[in-house]
């Protein structure tokens, strides 16, 4: 029978396997091209990342140690008013994690959620997306205020030209001028 102890061992084993994979990919990238950068873009909810039965990634280890990643880009795809992972608190948690001086923190922003209707925002459990067209801009400004965020990644490129997102994208562009 599959005991609780075996499950814990399986979780530990899966964590070790993912750590080894990340370390080996990093080494392969650096061996192939020394100046290339390698990073990961995990889900933004740190609590979920550390559940023992799903992601199996130790982002704290990867960020604080050498030989794993050059950057990390958590997907913080929520507004400031999200009930589980409000942007400000989630960004702050990531920014305050211990980090090797060579590991950059980029924040993944949800361009694909910009301009959602009220019904669409309700469907993703984040009504804030339907209430403001300055969310992405404010998220960048908050990240900058931490002095710990090195940049931003917008998902996805297609949303730069999506009509419903036009106001959000125009406001976002203002902070990059």
Q: Could you describe each region identified by the protein language model?
A:
Residues 60, 64-84, 94-177:
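Substrate-binding cleft of secreted/luminal carbohydrate-active enzymes
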